[in-house]
Amino acid sequence: MKLFVPALLSLGALGLCLAAPRKNVRWCTISQPEWLKCHRWQWRMKKLGAPSITCVRRAFVLECIRAITEKKADAVTLDGGMVFEAGLDPYKLRPVAAEIYGTKESPQTHYYAVAVVKKGSNFQLDQLQGRNSCHTGLGRSAGWNIPMGILRPYLSWTESLEPFQGAVAKFFSASCVPCVDRQAYPNLCQLCKGEGENQCACSPREPYFGYSGAFKCLQDGAGDVAFVKETTVFENLPEKADRDQYELLCLNNTRAPVDAFKECHLAQVPSHAVVARSVDGKEDLIWKLLSKAQEKFGKNKSGSFQLFGSPPGQRDLLFKDCALGFLRIPSKVDSALYLGSRYLTALKNLRETAEEVQARRARVVWCAVGPEEQKKCQQWSQQSGQIVTCATASTTDDCIALVLKGEADALSLDGGYIYTAGKCGLVPVLAENRKSSKHSSLDCVLRPTEGYLAVAVVKKANEGLTWNSLKGKKSCHTAVDRTAGWNIPMGLIANQTGSCAFDEFFSQSCAPGADPKSRLCALCAGDDQGLDKCVPNSKEKYYGYTGAFRCLAEDVGDVAFVKNDTVWENTNGESTADWAKNLNREDFRLLCLDGTRKPVTEAQSCHLAVAPNHAVVSLSERAAHVEQVLLHQQALFGENGKNCPDKFCLFKSETKNLLFNDNTECLAKLGGRPTYEEYLGTEYVTAIANLKKCSTSPLLEACAFLTR
């Protein structure tokens, strides 16, 4: 799989060709000016013989979202707040292309939400009560979600007595908030300028709708503050002398010039995005259309039609006038991943009661991979009194994604997944520490981690098998992207062979997480009914350290790539599992990199590499809370906890290594807050980075986009 290479491009409006509906994109418009621009785009695309387009007219954005869901339209561009709405049930739309702002040399897929005021007005951000306010629209990012989330502590909102809009209506003297129900909240529409039914409309029929409309509300003297994005002032006031008549309100209750938006803003917001259906969404066709439109009508292209431009007196038709182009959004990115945990948290703060917000902040949501981990997690949750609650995903990558969305807080990962999580912006919090012969006198929580040994195990009876004769044999792996079971052995093999064709080195394998149709999954068994073959969770019989060793023990594979403790934990009566209870340690050997073989007791001198300990990861803003809760939990349920083994044990499992490794003595502090690179070490990070040149993952592809 190739690494994701972003493609920068521009975009415009759409056209009409009904002859081949599968090759046609139906773009949704919300006003007559948008519909006219769309038809100009349609006519020009038709002349090119490029992907055809049809222009669909609806009254407002939510109707466009419904039309796409019902397959009556295919695409529309939305701001972050509406991307969130579109991603919810029953719509389930996903962003497929993001608008790019900034400069060609420094493109960015975000913008800044700002509060603009007239110079000389004498108030700060914490003094807005009783003022007049101008908003882009209800539920929109810069105009509503961000500023109202920030101002919520000042609103005296009693959730049980009134909706949030009611509290805002009482907070400001008067407002223009397009899209609000003007019958229910007349004060929020009082400043709006539309006539008759168009007053407070959720479209350009309301003159104060959108970024330019909200700024005009301020310019006209109707409002005292306009909640817009950083480029709005520049687009409407190209002359610096005119811009100097306005200022920004800062979070620290100071003011700054309008060009100081990087230092003085309310929040950084994901850029506007084109959305489509998650299933049968014509994603490739939409991208092909955008690519062709960029090539012919993009920024700085000559001609009467400009994709990122609007006629005099109009702004931001179909797309933002200030956009440079579009970046394709990887398929792994849904609306929640696109918006990110901080933005989603701001939205939750607007929708939940104060008690719900406090409860959410106090608990830790642990992500369990697969049904067996889910079962153990639910036991933990019950014993913790719901201080720890559970989220579940079918793969580790999906759990990492849940943490990125703020739907989970933490999980413990092996080094390979720590690399992935780190690339996505998560940080190590605590390390799984095993018993130590070197530092046995030190408190486990404060003791440095020593790593573990990644080994290649074979049966003693298979006498001719060495590291140098593995090609063509059968292999057992913990899972793709895990350290001892994949990254270390396959990295070594790739370096020796100079090839990334991992499915050609061994004749057959079980590498959970690989393509189920490939030779890398040929040896996998699935569950007791033969289902879920090669899935990277406990449903697959040969998943994980114990599963990979079982694959060898049952003569399915010739070699198992595990950690050295795995052999000890499953031989000489250490395991009561039927398949392991009669296994003898002496019947197994380790393969050394020099081509020799040694007993499993000699792993210190015969291993593939020293691997970093597993560690708990979380978002940086949740790390301190996660650490505090986990240290308290292990005091109750850790190896020497007062409620283990009577009630529950964190580091024991009905099968093996669920949530944490069973040989964990404690979760240890890391000393400061190291980055994932610092925790894993330079050599390991470099080795994984080289291995990722052979193949990446959809999640890494997504995170490369999200963190650019």
UniProtKB/Swiss-Prot annotation:
Residue span(s) of domain Transferrin-like: 25-352, 364-693
Q: Which GO terms describe its cellular component?
A: early endosome; extracellular space; plasma membrane; recycling endosome; specific granule
Q: What class of enzyme is it?
A: hydrolase
The chain's disulfide connectivity reads 28-64, 38-55, 134-217, 176-192, 179-202, 189-200, 250-264, 367-399, 377-390, 424-703, 444-666, 476-551, 500-694, 510-524, 521-534, 592-606, 644-649
The record's Gene3D superfamilies line, in alphabetical order, gives: Periplasmic binding protein-like II
Q: Which residues bind Fe cation 2?
A: 414, 452, 545, 614
Q: Which gene encodes it?
A: LTF
Family membership noted in the UniProt record: Belongs to the transferrin family.
Query: What's its EC?
Result: 3.4.21.-
Record's protein name? Lactotransferrin
Active site as annotated: 92, 278
Name the positions where hydrogencarbonate 1 binds: 136, 140, 142-143
Q: What keywords does the record list, in alphabetical order?
A: Disulfide bond, Glycoprotein, Hydrolase, Immunity, Ion transport, Iron, Iron transport, Metal-binding, Osteogenesis, Protease, Repeat, Secreted, Serine protease, Signal, Transport
Does this UniProt record's set of keywords contain Protease? yes
Against InterPro entries, the record matches this protein to: Lactotransferrin (IPR030684), Transferrin (IPR016357), Transferrin-like_dom (IPR001156), Transferrin_Fe_BS (IPR018195)
Q: Where does hydrogencarbonate 2 bind?
A: 478, 482, 484-485
* Natural source organism: Bubalus bubalis (Domestic water buffalo)
- Please tell me where Fe cation 1 binds in this chain: 79, 111, 211, 272
